[in-house]
Curated annotation (Swiss-Prot):
CRISPR (clustered regularly interspaced short palindromic repeat), is an adaptive immune system that provides protection against mobile genetic elements (viruses, transposable elements and conjugative plasmids). CRISPR clusters contain spacers, sequences complementary to antecedent mobile elements, and target invading nucleic acids. CRISPR clusters are transcribed and processed into CRISPR RNA (crRNA). Acts as a dsDNA endonuclease. Involved in the integration of spacer DNA into the CRISPR cassette. This is CRISPR-associated endonuclease Cas1 2. Its cofactor is Mg(2+); Mn(2+). Mn(2+) binds at residues 157, 224, 237. Belongs to the CRISPR-associated endonuclease Cas1 family. GO terms for biological process: defense response to virus; maintenance of CRISPR repeat elements. Its EC number is 3.1.-.-. Homodimer, forms a heterotetramer with a Cas2 homodimer. PANTHER family: CRISPR-ASSOCIATED ENDONUCLEASE CAS1, CRISPR-ASSOCIATED ENDONUCLEASE CAS1 1. The lineage of its organism: Bacteria, Pseudomonadati, Chlorobiota, Chlorobiia, Chlorobiales. The keyword Mitochondrion does not apply. It comes from Chlorobaculum tepidum (strain ATCC 49652 / DSM 12025 / NBRC 103806 / TLS). It comes from the Bacteria. The gene is cas1-2. It is an enzyme of class 3 (hydrolase). InterPro entries: Cas1, Cas1_I-E, CRISPR-assoc_Cas1, CRISPR-assoc_Cas1_C, CRISPR-assoc_Cas1_ECOLI, CRISPR-assoc_Cas1_N.
Length: 296
């Protein structure tokens, strides 16, 4: 945070007030995300500000934001990025309506203890399989997974998700021909698939920012592999049923098949807040990795 004071000769002097790690809110206390497009983020002497394409100015409380999703037509100054990093506010570059996740800016953390623990688990095949079982146990609380292999559990999950799609289609009386998404061909998808794609991309961004801020690596996964963010996809599967899948089918029915980007963004945001997603991520990682995470 910056403010102006008068120097000894009456001239304005800039005073930099350092924000310490201890004064920042924990991830669970932050607002999940803010999506911005067609504008500019910069800093003045008092705060981070957003200037939209109509020259409207909005102050951004970045210390209370988990991440900012930057859509098309956005620019951000070097100084603004520096202040957001100090406030532990993640930055993700996404496509229109958060449809595609492109990149993220990693905020610095005070130590690498959490990532070291994560790496040790992933490097040990037996322990990595234990972590995978704990992840699947969230979706199969009544199943005995003790002797199941990773391919077997992945097969169980595939069947569960396909059945879930069919149940949602029946529940909301929505036509369903299967999950389909081709990069660069978003408009070719049906409404339900469009909402699923948009919601999942936004979900990945939120989880990515939280994982970074807690000092874990998004690149070290236990179920997914061959992708750039396997740990993010591992975690996202815990929450998709509530924040993406049910939402997609219910909104398709509510909007009579039309794609209303503003309503989708609003309803997705409500779901994230209602289930207290940021309050769940930390404890869930603690349970999955068998370790109390470092405070953010």
């Amino acid at each position: 945070m910056k403010s102006n004071t008068l120097g000894d000769e009456g001239n304005p002097a800039r005073l930099l007030i350092k924000v310490t790690r201890e004064t920042l809110p924990q991830v669970k206390e932050k607002y999940p995300f803010l999506y911005l497009e067609k504008g500019r983020i910069e800093i003045d002497d008092s705060s981070i500000k957003w200037i939209d394409c109509d020259c409207n100015v909005v102050r951004l409380p970045v210390a209370m934001l988990n991440c900012i999703l930057l859509g098309p037509g956005t620019t951000v100054t070097h100084e603004a990025v520096k202040v957001m990093a100090a406030a532990n506010c993640g930055i993700c570059w996404v496509g229109d309506d958060s449809l595609m996740f492109y990149a993220s800016g990693q905020t610095p953390t005070s130590n690498t203890r959490n990532m070291t623990h994560q790496m040790k688990l992933a490097a040990n095949p037996a322990k990595a399989l234990e972590v995978a079982r704990r992840l699947f146990a969230y979706r199969f609380p009544d199943a005995n997974l003790e002797n199941k292999t990773l391919p077997q559990m992945m097969g169980m999950e595939g069947l569960r998700v396909r059945k879930l799609y069919e149940e949602m289609a029946v529940k909301y009386k929505v036509g369903w021909k299967g999950r389909r998404f081709e990069p660069g061909k978003f408009e070719m998808s049906d409404t339900t698939n469009k909402i699923l794609t948009a919601s999942n991309a936004a979900l990945y961004s939120i989880i990515l920012s939280a994982v970074h801020s807690m000092g874990y690596s998004p690149h070290i996964g236990f179920i997914h592999s061959g992708s750039p963010l396997p740990f993010i996809y591992d975690l996202a599967d815990l929450y998709k049923q509530q924040v993406s899948i049910d939402l997609a089918f219910s909104l398709t029915a509510d909007m009579a098949g039309y794609y209303d980007r503003h309503k989708i963004a609003s309803e997705f945001r409500k779901r994230v807040i209602e289930i207290d997603l940021l309050g769940k991520i930390g404890p869930d990682i603690e349970t999955i990795l068998g370790k109390k995470q470092c405070s953010s």
